[in-house]
Amino acid sequence: MTNIRKNHPLLKIINNSLIDLPTPPNISSLWNFGSLLGACLTIQIITGLFLAMHYTADTTTAFSSVTHICRDVNYGWTIRYLHANGASVFFLCLFIHVGRGLYYGSFTLLETWNVGIILLFSVMATAFMGYVLPWGQMSFWGATVITNLLSAIPYIGTDLVEWIWGGFSVSKATLTRFFALHFVLPFVILALVMIHLLFLHETGSNNPLGTSSNSDKIPFHPYYTTKDFLGLLLLILLLMVLTLFYPDLLGDPDNYSPANPLNTPPHIKPEWYFLFAYAILRSIPNKLGGVMALILSILILAIIPLLQPNKQQTMMFRPLSQFLFWILVADLLTLTWIGGQPVEDPFITIGQVASILYFLLMVLIMPTTCLIENKMLKW
C-alpha cells in the first residue's frame, strides 16, 4: 500500500512542497527567511482578523475603537501590539530575504524574482494603509502627505488624488476604503505567495555556491523543517520581546494623539521600514522627481537581472562585489537614519549623497565591478 500523502490530490501538493521536496544540502540559515515570512503573514492575518472584529472604520470612532481594544478587550493590547510589531518583524525578514537574493544571485530565477517584487510592493501598500487606520496624528498626516504625492503626476494627478481620497481631503471615505483594502490585500498577498512558491519549485532553490545541486539533494523534511522551526522560535522570541517589553519602541508618540487636520506634527515621518524610501523622496527638491526616485528605489530590483553580467552566480567568491554589497547595506541604513531626521543641514546633504550612491551602486558601480571580476578570472 502506497503512502496516502503521495497519492491524495490535496496532500500530494503539500507533500511535494514541504515534505519530499528535493532541496540542496548546503543552503544556510539565510534560506530560512522564506518560511519565516510565511509565519509572519499568518500571524498578521490572524491578529488582524481579531482586531477587525472590534475596530470601527469611522473618523469619529476609529481612534476610540483602538483605545477600546487596548483597554477593554481581553488581551486586546497583546493582539494590537503583536500586529503592529509583527509588521516590523515582517519587514525585517523581508529585507534580509531580498538581500540574500541579491548576494547569492537568486534574481536569475526570473519569474520567482519578479513575483517577489510584486509581493514587496503589495506588502508595502498594505502596511501603509494599516498605519492610517488607528487615526492618530501621524496616521492622518502620513496619509495626507503620501497620497498627495500622486498629484505630481502630470494632467491627471489632482483628479487621481481626489479619487483616492473620495473627497477634497483625507476623510471618512478615505479611512473606510483604506480599511477595506487593508483587510483584503493580505489574502491577495497569500495568493501571490502561492505563485511565488510555484515558480520557485519549478526551478528548485539556489544555493550559496551558485552551482547546480541536481546531483545531490536531500528531502525537505526532516532536515529543513527542523532548521526552519529553530528560526521560527527565534522569530517568536524577538516578536514577544518587542511586544511585551518594548511595545512602543518602533512606533511614533504622535500617533497617541487623535487626528487633527488643523494641527500639523513638527516632523511627519512613516514607520522605520519606509524611512529609506522616504529619505530618497525628500532628497530631491522637485516633487515629480522625488516621486519617481521613490518608486525607482524599489522598482530598480526588477532590472537587477539585466544589470548583472557576472559569470559566477553568487558573490561568495567575488570579494570586490561583496565589499560593494556591504557598502549598499550601510548606505540603506544611512538612508533609514536620515529619513527619521528633520529636514535641515547636514541631514539634507547626507541624504542626497546617500541617495545618489544608492542608485550609482545599483546601476553603475556593481555591474562594472562584475565585468572587472570576469576579466580577472579570464572569463
UniProtKB/Swiss-Prot annotation:
Q: Which residues bind heme b b566?
A: 97, 196
Task: Name any one Pfam family assigned in the record.
Answer: Cytochrom_B_C
Organism field: Lepilemur edwardsi (Milne-Edwards's sportive lemur)
Question: How does the UniProt record describe the way this protein sits in the membrane?
Answer: Multi-pass membrane protein
Q: How is the cofactor bound?
A: Binds 2 heme b groups non-covalently.
Q: How does it assemble?
A: The cytochrome bc1 complex contains 11 subunits: 3 respiratory subunits (MT-CYB, CYC1 and UQCRFS1), 2 core proteins (UQCRC1 and UQCRC2) and 6 low-molecular weight proteins (UQCRH/QCR6, UQCRB/QCR7, UQCRQ/QCR8, UQCR10/QCR9, UQCR11/QCR10 and a cleavage product of UQCRFS1). This cytochrome bc1 complex then forms a dimer.
A Gene Ontology annotation in the biological process aspect, one of them, is:
mitochondrial electron transport, ubiquinol to cytochrome c
Q: Where in the cell is it found?
A: Mitochondrion inner membrane
Keyword annotations: Electron transport, Heme, Iron, Membrane, Metal-binding, Mitochondrion, Mitochondrion inner membrane, Respiratory chain, Transmembrane, Transmembrane helix, Transport, Ubiquinone
Q: What PROSITE patterns is this protein classified in?
A: CYTB_CTER, CYTB_NTER
Give the GO molecular function terms: metal ion binding; ubiquinol-cytochrome-c reductase activity
Protein name listed in UniProt: Cytochrome b
